[in-house]
Amino acid sequence: MNSAVEAQLAELGIEGYLKQHQYKSLLRFLTCGSVDDGKSTLIGRLLHDSKQIYEDQLAAVHSDSQRVGTTGEKPDLALLVDGLQAEREQGITIDVAYRYFSTQKRKFIIADTPGHEQYTRNMATGASTCDLAVILVDARKGVLDQTRRHSFISNLLGLKHFVVAINKMDLVDYSQERFEEIRDEYLQFSENLAGETDIQIIPLSALEGDNVVEKGQNLSWFEGPSLLELLETVDVDHEKGEGDFRFPVQYVNRPNLDFRGFAGTISSGSVKVGDAIKALPSGKTSTVARIVTFDGDVQEAQAGLAVTLTLNDEIDISRGDLLVLENAQVESTNHLLADVVWMTEQPLQPGRDYDIKIAGKKTVGHVEAIRHQYDINNLSTHGAAELPLNGIGLCEWSLNESVALDNYQDCADTGGFIIIDRLTNVTVGAGMVKESLAAVERGLADVSAFELELNALVRKHFPHWEAKDLSQLLKK
């Protein structure tokens, strides 16, 4: 048991501690930056100084520091996070490492992402679930290409809060002049980032512990908060709840003949019993009869809550459909523009079919054209015939059916999708919807002979289904 938990248990008792812990807000954040900027050391210092390390973990770090550490006689706190043997031996981070800790004010999930360019896909994966990015800058080196790259990817993936931590201030004698020089350079670069971003820039030393949890005497000239104070006070819960109601249906829950509910997690906004809702892409409407949770029925539910909704009308809803408020303006389209992060050796090629999964909906799609590829070192763009591993580009997609979706910046759950290779079933890329384009009508040439024959058999043997004649429909 670590000392912080032990102290809280002594003060509150086990029931009081669990109750307090249950209602703490949760912040997911990632650390990113260039190679050897000290990301893993920073997380280790954060855990150590907030008393979140168990005694056996600390003993193991002391032991390993003698063998593979890089800090001389001091314990190498980066070893708390770099868990893979290859990472420890090379002194770098390869995979995305997750760590969990809590303070008296908040719970945290940390994603420690790799800094090397060839692991850009790992960093994008880590950023996709986070609310805030801690971007480390080496005080000796200043803003590097990788700093710009990770800032751009974090911005692309919808993160609105950035903490730029200028690390290794101990190696520049805690120079205020050097801090201000790097701060101005980063702020100038950040003008190119999309949307409204909240950027906080702080100096610190992860190795010595200055301004990580406590302010420290060496940075007395800095009047802002420490890193932990920033993380404890940033408001992300309000932002999640203020959007329009979006509820992707994950499962039709029918435990008996008397109950039919639609299970899922509310992506944004809120819903109340009695609200008029609309199912997309069908457009059929109803009203909410009950909101069922694990703890029983509630009258209202907000973003992030897993619920089962029952409706007053029996309308056709299945997995992959999207429930919104009746007056919501949501587009259903089979033609869209999206930023794509490519994650496999075989490049993305226009015209090739891929499985697309978006908010529980699975369909098939292909890239019509790659509008441009981003140079993520300077945010410029250039033409590209295909998208290579770790490449990011703006692509025009066509899907086999209409899908209800939002812009990714408005709602990540209903505006983000993954791209799956149809032969290997491997996830090969991730997409972020930028805008819906005019729907593409399928021509007769796009319909196979098998589909036409099946359509004719359905109309012949199941006339009560009232299926339309495909051959006649496509001639119009």
Swiss-Prot record:
GO molecular function, one term: GTP binding
E.C. designation(s): 2.7.7.4
Ranges for region G1: 33-40
Lineage top rank: taxon: Bacteria
UniProt pathway: Sulfur metabolism; hydrogen sulfide biosynthesis; sulfite from sulfate: step 1/3
PROSITE patterns per UniProt: G_TR_1, G_TR_2
Assembly behavior: Heterodimer composed of CysD, the smaller subunit, and CysN.
Protein family membership: Belongs to the TRAFAC class translation factor GTPase superfamily. Classic translation factor GTPase family. CysN/NodQ subfamily.
Function: With CysD forms the ATP sulfurylase (ATPS) that catalyzes the adenylation of sulfate producing adenosine 5'-phosphosulfate (APS) and diphosphate, the first enzymatic step in sulfur assimilation pathway. APS synthesis involves the formation of a high-energy phosphoric-sulfuric acid anhydride bond driven by GTP hydrolysis by CysN coupled to ATP hydrolysis by CysD.
Protein name as it appears in the record: Sulfate adenylyltransferase subunit 1
Organism: Vibrio campbellii (strain ATCC BAA-1116)
Gene: cysN
